[in-house]
Amino acid sequence: MTQIFDSVSFLKTVTHQPGVYRMYNAEAVVIYVGKAKDLKKRLSSYFRKKVDSEKTKALVSNIAKIDVTVTHTETEALILEHNYIKQYLPKYNVLLRDDKSYPYIFLSAHRHPRVSLHRGAKKRKGEYFGPYPDSGAVRETLHLIQKIFPVRQCEDTVYANRTRPCLMYQIGRCAGPCVSSVISDVDYAELVGYLRLFLQGKDNQVLELLVQKMEIASQQLKFEDAAKFRDQIQAIRRVQEQQYVSEDSQEDMDVLGFAQENGIACIHILMIRQGKVLGSRSHFPKIPQNTNAQEVFDSFLTQYYLSHNEARTIPSRIILNQELAADVEAIQLALSDVAGRKVQFHTSPSGSRGRYLKLSNTNALTAMTTKINHKMTINQRFKALRDVLAMDSIARMECFDISHTMGESTIASCVVFNSEGPVKQEYRRYNITGITGGDDYAAMGQALERRYAKQLDVEKIPDVIFIDGGKGQLNRAHEIIAQYWGDWPKRPVMIGIAKGVTRKPGLETLITVDGDEFHLPSDDPALHLIQHIRDESHNHAIAGHRAKRGKTRKTSALEGIEGVGPKRRQALLKYTGGLQELKRASVEEIAKVPGISHSLAEIIYQALKQ
């Protein structure tokens, strides 16, 4: 630090009101954001002569400036603190590494409603059920729904262009509303009504209705219908046995388990909606050294619930451990304010709630132990690689790969690893253009130029660069990167990874820029790390290539037609249900598409027939 922060003069200007403070270092970077009920009292605590916390000592030694924002209430301060943490990602704050939105089950407002997975903003007309902990839980529920309530799950464009029921109808997974002779609107609406009640958690109401239906069908000697209702009843009861917490509880709850050890904290959330367990998820926030459990937990609570602040995602009850409830009153008030209803925290649960809290704590401990073991494995692999490459330290590695099919839709990928493993938010794909199809050297050169030609922050310069390829690829990569590393404070080690003759894992040949080749034993931890980063790069490239190839093949036939831009292409595909259906359409059918004249329809028809 170039100067010592004058805390005495600063504290004279601070008020006793609630608010938020931002601490900056000498480079004017925000290093900590905090909130307080009494700003003067809280900020004074940092500058006492005797401070026990090592984290606080380290923080104070780096302070060059403090900004203060006064708020009307502590709740306002809490929300503002959360927004600042999201904006600045300060070094000394606990950071929740979770930018994923939670998935829902969506029931559309269509004449014949469709049920599907939904993630993101709720813009479409219809009903949303959830949230679910992950897409796997949603797909499992949708699979179950298909068996009990065969409401359609096909896209509207597919539905609109059916002339006879699809395979899903044949195997009993769809009622077939696309064909009017299969099921009436009234019967389909009744089926959707059962599904709606089921997703709302009103299983017993559905059971009562189905039992009545079964008895009526039996009395009328419609035994096939009665058997169908019986199967639905049995399936719902099996689901109830698997999911219900208690028969008398129909409330929404989150049960939060907690574990912390060796600089790693885990919060395990068990999600219960309408009395049913939807699933669970473990979270591992990024925590500064010497951060106590209370601060970790409070920071997590705020960031987790305010990041997903739609009213439906905040349950009416949150169950947590007694020893972590010291300072949650302000958080409870803030969540109630955001949700628009009272949110209650329970710290001494009994009965089924107590059992689920114990289970959640056990899951948190198990997940944390697994994480620690994984970290130890990664550390061992990094140490082995340092020994193999004779390097003092490896903080960052990058790996490049190229993917294409016979030169079509070429994509390059770059993946990043640090000492904790993959850094997926820094993965990148490069759309390769302007080269001869199949020229991997040119593709690699273009990707590396786009990656390294721009100015890099020091911490973004890799210690090791892996190239998935042989000597030619590595030499080309070295030529490109050598143009840019003149101003770098360090020069990365470059290694080529050539597959063995049989392309079998464990037989890879490693190549240096000097042309030396070497192999590692198949059980060597260093080789396992190299295989890991190579496979990540390979999979990332293939995923991008397949997506690009699929998009190209779907639209390329229309892209060359004069007068057909993106909007008309979209209208054509949406109206007809896809490219193959469009190719089979007549001129008159194409002319029915909104925005397509008869003369343009003839041009499109002739172009697609070539």
UniProtKB/Swiss-Prot annotation:
Domain UVR: residue ranges: 204-239
Domain of life: Bacteria
GO biological process, one term: SOS response
InterPro entries the UniProt entry points to: GIY-YIG_endonuc, GIY-YIG_endonuc_sf, GIY-YIG_UvrC_Cho, Hlx-hairpin-Hlx_DNA-bd_motif, RuvA_2-like, UVR_dom, UVR_dom_sf, UvrABC_protein_C
Keywords on record: Cytoplasm, DNA damage, DNA excision, DNA repair, Excision nuclease, SOS response
GIY-YIG domain location: 16-94
Listed GO CC annotations: cytoplasm; excinuclease repair complex
GO molecular function: DNA binding; excinuclease ABC activity
Predominant location category: cytoplasm
Subcellular location: Cytoplasm
Alphabetical list of SUPFAM superfamilies matching this protein: C-terminal UvrC-binding domain of UvrB, GIY-YIG endonuclease, RuvA domain 2-like
Family label: Belongs to the UvrC family.
PANTHER family hit by this protein: UVRABC SYSTEM PROTEIN C, UVRC/OXIDOREDUCTASE
Function as written in the Swiss-Prot or TrEMBL entry: The UvrABC repair system catalyzes the recognition and processing of DNA lesions. UvrC both incises the 5' and 3' sides of the lesion. The N-terminal half is responsible for the 3' incision and the C-terminal half is responsible for the 5' incision.
Subunit structure: Interacts with UvrB in an incision complex.
Name of this chain's protein: UvrABC system protein C
Organism from which the protein derives: Vibrio vulnificus (strain YJ016)
